[in-house]
Design a protein with these regions (language model features):
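Extended repeat-based scaffolds of very large eukaryotic assembly and lipid-transport proteins
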Residues: 1-112
């Protein structure tokens, strides 16, 4: 699938972007604006990652990223078409205080 701001992505890349708060806006994936939209994207991303991989790292995108990279081509995360842009966006999101706070909140509330 071709996404305006990332190029040709594979589903697993979309799921990880959602987990770090990216949402669909037309034919692009952009950082969600607003807390509810961000939470919805993160929940959708987590469910999709769990369903696709059979693994569960919860709301820990760094652990998901490491897992997807370590599984190599099996997961498809490192597919070359969009990997560099997607991974850069994921890594940048891992340093965003808003993303970190929302992931922490979801981790605490969704498991309670």
């Amino acid at each position: 699938m071709t996404i305006r701001n990332f190029g040709r992505v594979v589903p697993i890349q979309i799921f990880l972007l959602q987990l770090v708060g990216y949402e669909w806006k037309g034919r692009s994936l952009d950082p969600a604006t607003g807390g509810n939209a961000r939470k919805r994207a993160m929940r959708d991303g987590l469910r999709s990652l769990q369903k696709s991989t059979g693994a569960d790292f919860g709301y820990n995108p760094a652990a998901w990223r490491e897992h997807l990279i370590s599984t190599g081509e099996e997961a498809g995360y490192k597919h070359p078409y969009a990997f560099a842009r997607v991974d850069q966006a994921v890594c940048k999101s891992l340093e965003d205080p808003t993303v970190i706070a929302t992931l922490k909140e979801l981790s605490e509330s969704d498991t309670a």
